[in-house]
């Protein structure tokens, strides 16, 4: 029989302090950015924001202050406002009448008029109910941006009575900004329904264009069936770039198809004639227009959702001006520590080439950014690796012209013309394991690669079109290719690379790694904002992204965390990609902490340590989930817990007998035993609780594994939720008993075995 003991005080803290959570959530911030050297007032829409008192913005040079929290009014509160408004209207009406004989005149004051305006604003908000509950609550913030603050995306979190919210993007820019008045969208026009079919076919007449001067960033929120327009003066010969940021601000919307604000841009002349339009840029959902102005005059930039949907969280920023824009680079990467000459394509650029070294930087992905005068370009990714590098030659589009390469190598090339292919010859021996990996789409290239490996006689050995990289959470079309195969015999082999859609052009660059396996791993931990009560325990999802066939166990540990945090079940089992572990909070209250999770594994006899990247598990269009990387893993401990509490959890995995039952003994303080029940939280298929029996100094738990379910060797963690069922009201005996959550216990490692369970 396996036994585990927990200190009584800690068990009390875990069960008593933790209740069913209402997780604070933010859905949008508007405006979603500001100019450095200025201050901006923003609205943050979300849910469970009660007690919002502090805002956290990543990076230096920005400071946010919560100025007000606005919760939607209840029906009774709204009626009270209506009654007060009626009294004031009656008073105003009476003040205009001649008073009756002997009666004092009714005086309607300036203060009364001001109060009516305040009431009208509040009642307007009541009549325009928020589209959905998840963005119904509002926090008002004042953000100061230093003049020397770095340009780029920051992450904004609110600290509420329920803890930290998820992060959301707030952009720091360098251009003048204009923001439209915030909007409210009625529920009938929510993002799922969008505009009516009639409005989609012929949207209502848009409001008059807003007059702006270039260069500028304009901020707005899209409403259903409408288009926002901006009029500006431009000079003939200017290359004006119009770039929308919408999906970049809010990557995924869970309750919409498509699963984001799909912005569409149109450029018109003064008479309304369409000059250019776009609803994407290559595979990027956010559109970009570059247009050479034909003559001096007035022009109109217009934005709308592609199917005329709209809601408060359909937030956009449009950058307009004769500004530097990088559209592609070549090569897409280089060797770490070596200088690389990079050719750059785009508009309004100061140079066509740059010489970069990224001296001292380890392998990874870094942005290439240019400045022209006072303005900064967009950033494009550039990859550094430690392997030897070469460039694909011209004229290797046929097998007999294949370029011979020696492993290991990274080939930098491009499919320069539609229908073109590139062939590479490698020599190997029987049993050699090789990896061929294309990195293109993950570096901003539109290439949709295909890899095919054949032997000298033309027989296909391996083929791959797309492979899914869980680390590329912002890509919905994973278009890069990966082959891992073992060569059947000694000889020459030919690797063909082409575009699956037979497209090509100078922007269709790629990096092709050809090598023996380089086993490695990455980690993601979610959510990126974690809230738990003092002394309580909560589950955490850890995802292992295994590279080049690495299948070993990964030991997990906390870094930069106070020693009284406890990580339980701290390992990703060999051969598995996911595990749920638990984190137990200390007893003391603390400010939000930025901590780290690390993973350690033995690879080819060497210890390798990787730091987990915090991520949000975002839902797209009701169905798809993506791990989107965030800047920090923030933990908030709430409330007071027992002092000096500690856990003593299982030191070895519980061995569960397949097709049988395994007893597990948990020590629980007597005062928690009465009526306490346990339930498995998202257990593996086939593992269940057979019985829970109170005993003098704990709980006797019997776990069962179905005979046809889990295979021997399966490892992981079991997470138990404790609860009580409250007796139903005697006056409403037909109603079922209510489950009262008590908390979550630290993870119990397990292993499924054949035969008798371990003792």
Segments and roles (model prediction):
Residues 1-8:
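Bacterial N-terminal signal peptides that target proteins for export
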Residues 15, 571-574, 588, 654, ...:
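C-terminal segments of large proteins
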Residues 9-18:
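Hydrophobic h-region of N-terminal signal peptides that target proteins for export
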Residues 532-534, 646, 654-660:
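C-terminal luminal/periplasmic domains and tails of membrane-associated envelope-modifying transferases
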Residues 131-135, 281-283, 293, 475-477, ...:
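Short proline/glycine- and polar residue-rich coil/turn motifs
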Residues 18-213, 217-222, 304-310, 314-315, ...:
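Ser/Thr/Pro-rich low-complexity tracts
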């Amino acid at each position: 029989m396996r036994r585990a003991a927990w200190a009584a005080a800690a068990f009390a803290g875990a069960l008593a302090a933790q209740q069913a959570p209402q997780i604070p959530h933010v859905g949008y911030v508007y405006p979603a950015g500001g100019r450095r050297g200025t201050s901006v007032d923003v609205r943050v829409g979300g849910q469970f924001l009660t007690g919002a008192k502090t805002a956290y913005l990543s990076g230096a040079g920005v400071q946010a202050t919560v100025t007000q929290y606005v919760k939607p009014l209840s029906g009774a509160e709204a009626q009270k406002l209506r009654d007060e408004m009626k009294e004031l209207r009656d008073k105003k009406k009476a003040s205009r009448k001649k008073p009756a004989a002997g009666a004092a005149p009714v005086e309607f004051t300036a203060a009364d008029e001001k109060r009516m305006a305040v009431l009208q604003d509040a009642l307007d908000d009541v009549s325009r109910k928020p589209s959905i509950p998840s963005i119904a609550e509002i926090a008002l913030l004042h953000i100061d941006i230093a003049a020397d603050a770095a340009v780029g995306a920051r992450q904004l979190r609110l600290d509420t009575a329920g803890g930290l919210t998820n992060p959301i993007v707030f952009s720091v820019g360098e251009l003048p900004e204009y923001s439209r008045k915030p909007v409210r969208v009625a529920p009938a026009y929510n993002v799922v329904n969008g505009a009516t079919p009639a409005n989609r076919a012929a949207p209502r007449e848009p409001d008059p264009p807003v007059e702006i001067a270039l260069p500028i960033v304009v901020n707005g929120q899209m409403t259903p069936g409408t288009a926002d327009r901006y009029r500006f003066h431009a000079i003939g010969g200017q290359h004006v770039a119009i770039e929308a940021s919408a999906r970049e601000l809010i990557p995924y919307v869970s309750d919409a198809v498509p699963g984001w604000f799909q912005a569409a841009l149109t450029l018109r002349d003064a008479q309304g004639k369409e000059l250019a339009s776009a609803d994407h840029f290559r595979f990027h959902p956010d559109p970009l227009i570059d247009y050479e102005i034909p003559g001096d005059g007035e022009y109109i930039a217009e934005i709308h959702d592609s199917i005329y949907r709209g809601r408060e969280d359909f937030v956009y920023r449009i950058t307009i001006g004769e500004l530097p824009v990088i559209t592609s680079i070549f090569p897409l990467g280089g060797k770490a520590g070596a200088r690389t000459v990079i050719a750059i394509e785009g508009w309004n650029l100061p140079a066509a080439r740059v010489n970069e070294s990224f001296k001292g930087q380890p392998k990874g992905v870094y942005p290439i950014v240019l400045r022209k005068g006072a303005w900064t370009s967009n950033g494009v990714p550039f990859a550094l690796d430690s392997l030897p590098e070469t460039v694909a030659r011209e004229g290797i589009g046929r097998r007999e012209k294949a370029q011979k390469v020696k492993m290991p190598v990274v080939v930098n090339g491009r499919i320069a013309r539609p229908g073109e292919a590139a062939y590479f010859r490698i020599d190997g021996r029987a049993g050699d394991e090789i990896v061929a990996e294309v990195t293109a789409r993950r570096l901003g290239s539109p290439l949709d690669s295909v890899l095919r490996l054949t032997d000298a006689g033309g027989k296909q050995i391996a083929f791959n079109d797309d492979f899914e990289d869980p680390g590329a959470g912002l890509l919905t079309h994973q278009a890069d290719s990966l082959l891992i195969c073992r060569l059947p015999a000694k000889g020459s082999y030919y690797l063909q690379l082409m575009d699956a859609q037979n497209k090509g052009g100078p922007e269709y660059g790629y990096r092709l790694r050809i090598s023996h396996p380089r086993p490695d791993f990455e980690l993601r931990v979610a959510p990126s904002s974690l809230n738990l009560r003092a002394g309580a325990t909560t589950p955490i999802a850890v995802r292992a992204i295994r590279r080049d066939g690495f299948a070993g166990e990964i030991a997990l540990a906390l870094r930069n965390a106070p020693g009284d945090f406890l990580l339980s079940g701290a390992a990703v089992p060999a051969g598995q990609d996911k595990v749920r572990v638990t984190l137990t909070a200390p007893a003391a209250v603390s400010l939000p902490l930025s901590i780290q999770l690390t993973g350690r594994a033995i690879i080819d006899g060497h210890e390798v340590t990787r730091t987990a990247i915090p991520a949000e598990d975002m839902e797209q269009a009701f169905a798809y989930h993506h791990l989107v990387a965030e800047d920090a893993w923030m933990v908030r401990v709430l409330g007071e817990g027992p002092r000096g509490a500690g856990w003593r959890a299982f030191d070895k995995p519980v061995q569960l007998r397949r097709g049988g039952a395994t007893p597990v003994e948990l020590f629980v303080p007597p005062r928690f035993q009465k009526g306490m029940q346990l339930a498995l939280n998202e257990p593996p298929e086939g593992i269940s609780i057979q019985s829970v029996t109170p005993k003098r100094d704990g709980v006797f738990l019997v776990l069962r594994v179905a005979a046809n379910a889990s295979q021997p060797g399966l490892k992981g963690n079991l997470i138990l939720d404790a609860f009580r069922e409250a007796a139903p009201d005697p006056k409403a005996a037909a109603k079922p008993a209510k489950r009262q959550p008590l908390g979550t216990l630290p993870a119990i490692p397990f292993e499924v075995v054949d035969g008798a369970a371990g003792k």
